[in-house]
Amino acid sequence: MTEANYEHHLQAGEALVAQAQQAATTDFQRARALWQEAGKHFFHAHKQDETQVQAAFRLAQAWMAEAYALQKEASANALVMWSNAAAQCELAFDLNPEDGRIAMTAASCHHFAGEHDAAKAWKQIGEHLLGQDANEADNSQG
């Protein structure tokens, strides 16, 4: 359980994401396989250091990609995967509770999972945090 292993898995996952993004427009199945492999690396990075928000959030994003793929196939498992992605976003948010972007991502996942009350709550949290960020930026410029 070393920092080197964490970085190795994180970087390997990032490289696979880049490949998946390139493949997505021409070969969806290849992109999906690359996202799944990236997700495995993000999972291992997250397990190496569960205090790092980046690996936790990237794992959520990998699960979102899989949820989208399942949704595109009209699979009943899509809702479960969206719910799993939402839970992983919440875990990432717990590691960085000031990140409105993560809260908004959790809101989106809950929405696609059909969990509308949770989606609304997470959206409000995200809007609040992102509004604070905008106000702080305005105040620092003025």
Question: What are these regions, as identified by a protein language model?
Answer:
Residues 2-25, 51-72, 99-112, 137-142:
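Amphipathic alpha-helical repeat scaffolds of TPR domains
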Residues 10, 14-17, 21, 32, ...:
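Residue-level detector of alpha-helical secondary structure
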Residues 27-40, 75-86:
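Helix-turn-helix repeat elements of alpha-solenoid scaffolds
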Residues 33-44, 108-112, 125:
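Short, charge-rich amphipathic interface segments used for partner binding and complex assembly
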Residues 40, 46-47, 87-94, 127-128:
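Conserved structural position within tetratricopeptide repeats
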